[in-house]
Every structure is written in C-alpha cells, then in structure tokens.
Amino acid sequence: MSTWLLPENIADVLPSEARKIEELRRRLLDRFRSYGYEMVMPPLLEYLESLLTSGGADLRLRTFKLVDQLSGRTLGLRADITPQVARIDAHLLNRQGVTRLCYAGHVMHTRPRGLHATREQIQIGAEIYGHAGLEADLEIQQLMLDALHLAGLSRIRLDLCHAGVLAALLARDAQAAERGESLYDALSGKDVPLLNELTDDLGADTRAALRALPHLYGDASVLDEARARLPVLPEITRALDDLAQLAAQAKGVEVAIDLADLRGYAYHSGAMFTAYIDGVPNAIARGGRYDHVGQAYGRARPATGFSLDLRELARISPIEARGTAILAPWAQDDALGAAVAALRDAGEVVIQALPGHDHVLDEFACDRSLVERNGAWVVEPR
C-alpha cells in the first residue's frame, strides 16, 4: 500500500481551501462574539460514556472507540461537540443565569453522512443555556442565518419543525409511545406505508394525527391546516405558535414548515430549524432546542443552539479568500528588515523572494512590491 494514501472519506486540506475555511471561521466566531458568546474548547477525546449521553444509536454508531492505555477504559473521538458544551455548562461553569457559548473544532465520524461527505468535519456552533423562552430560539435562528449570510450565501431555505408535536401525540397514547422509535424513523423518512402499518391499530384520533404529519408541509400557511387536523392539546398549540413566530422572524429567506422533518439530532425537545441552499441536497446548518441534554451531567438546563460544518460551508461559499500581498526582496539589510517588520505590524502580508527563486506561487496575489528608491524602501504597485 502506498504510504501517501489516506482512509476513505478522509482528505487533506490544501492551502486554498484551508485559507477559505480559516477566513470563514474567523468571520463566524467574530460574529458570535458580537452577540456575547464566549468560546470554549472541549477535548477531542473523552470517556465514551460522557460523549454518548444523548444522541441515540446514531451518535454511538458514528463515534470512533479506542482503549485508554492509562486507565483501560473505553475512550471515544467526539462525533458531535454539543454534548461536550452541555457538560461544560452543567458541571464546570455551573452558572445560574443565561450562558452563551460557542465553539469550533474537529469531529470524527466512523461513517460518512453522504456518498462524498468527509468523515472529518470542522464543526462550528453556538449555544444558549438557561432560558426556556422562545426568545433564545429566535436569537439562535437569527445567528444561524447571520452566519450563512456572512459566508456569502443567498437563496436560503429555512425548514421548521417542532419535536413537541410528536411528543404530545405519544404522551397521550401509551400504545403509540411503545412504538416511538419506529414512528420516529417512519416520519423522518416519510415512509407512509410503514407509518400506516404502525398506526393501524391505534386510537382514531392518534392515528389520524400521526398520519397527517407527513402531509403537513409547505409555507407558513400550513400551520393553519395543522391546527385544524391535529388534536387541540396545549403542547401542540404552543408548538405551532412557536413555529409561527420563528417563521415570521426569518426575513429574506424562504420558510417551509415540515412537521415530519425529525431527522438530525435525536436530543431535540422543541423547535428545530434546518437551513438548505439551492443546488445542495443536504442541510448546510441545523439547530434547535434540547432542554434535557445536560441531565446526564447532573444539571438539566434549558438549551438551544445550532451547528454547521465549516468544510462544507467553505465548499459552497462564494467568498474570495485569496489575500493580497507585498513582494519584497531578500537581503541582509537593516533598513529592509525594518520596513518589512513595519508593514507586517500594520497587518500587511509581506513575502520575501528567496535567492534563486523567481517564480512566486499564486496563493497570495502579490499586487505590490517593496523597492528601494533614493535610499528608502517604499511600496509600489506591481
């Protein structure tokens, strides 16, 4: 086997892509900070049980496992940073009020999410802990859309769903609750024949409501249809009201309601929002409420947040990250060295051409030169 081969769905990030990823990372983290989010950096490696406190079987399957040579315990390479941030909020920070946290780091997956997807993503996201009201969901949704606009994306479609609708239907029917996981799978995959089979012997009201969910899809007006077709339960009414407010806030994007779109993170407990871009089949960003995620760490707090993969964002972003630079000669000259240092201190990129190498790679656009004129080093256009 060639020593330069990499595992399937694992790839190096070359300079042009890395530059774009880093530009986007800085833009997004700066925007998060402007909202008041504090950055945290959880470890890439943790004890397996700490990583799998939520997320269900899918997260367990996607997590790489290995044995710790020091303790003999099973470790996991994180496949999702959100549970780690919940642990930090619940156990380490232990604050009583609202906490805003953000992060950016690598995650590893045992299996790719798609045919050409990478198994090493760069996950970036933001979370709000400590506020159960819809205001936190509205802020997170706005921040997610801001992040996509900062990346230069347009023609964004925002899909909205609410985990509380299905939860309310299962809570009122014990027989349906026993089939909760199968119903979840059928709804997520919009497998209507399977859904019909699973609901055939349920009570008439529950059966009709569950079978209606895959068809409650469309613009915000579908919420009126949902109010007519679903049982009048306080939890469902509240969920539909939340979705109406989230849809109204999403200015400048196409909004779709899909009450069966339960794909994604298994730990959602409330509103869920997913962003799609024209021409890209998979979601570019996902978010929502997951109030119970910190319970495994001894302190369940209201929580809502979103995340996306920076590598995928860089792939589809139209922004141009190729920076300009100044080309300078190489010489053991104190005045030249001082001029180069001053330019770099001012934020300029200065590339010194090493002796014998006339060819300059185009990773930076050297649109200016540092030249000596009348005993002084000055910058001139090339």
UniProtKB/Swiss-Prot annotation:
CDD domains linked: HisRS-like_core
Major localisation: cytoplasm
SUPFAM superfamilies reported in the protein's UniProt record: Class II aaRS and biotin synthetases (SSF55681)
Pathway assignment: Amino-acid biosynthesis; L-histidine biosynthesis; L-histidine from 5-phospho-alpha-D-ribose 1-diphosphate: step 1/9
GO BP terms: histidyl-tRNA aminoacylation; L-histidine biosynthetic process
Localization terms from the record: Cytoplasm
The entry's keywords: Amino-acid biosynthesis, Cytoplasm, Histidine biosynthesis
InterPro entries named in the record: aa-tRNA-synth_II/BPL/LPL (IPR045864), HisRS-like_core (IPR041715), HisRS/HisZ (IPR004516), HisZ (IPR004517)
Listed GO MF terms: histidine-tRNA ligase activity
Recorded superkingdom: Bacteria
CC terms in the record's Gene Ontology section: cytoplasm
Record family assignment: Belongs to the class-II aminoacyl-tRNA synthetase family. HisZ subfamily.
Free-text function comment from the UniProt entry: Required for the first step of histidine biosynthesis. May allow the feedback regulation of ATP phosphoribosyltransferase activity by histidine.
Further remark: This function is generally fulfilled by the C-terminal part of HisG, which is missing in some bacteria such as this one.
Record text on subunit structure and interactions: Heteromultimer composed of HisG and HisZ subunits.
Name of the protein this chain belongs to: ATP phosphoribosyltransferase regulatory subunit
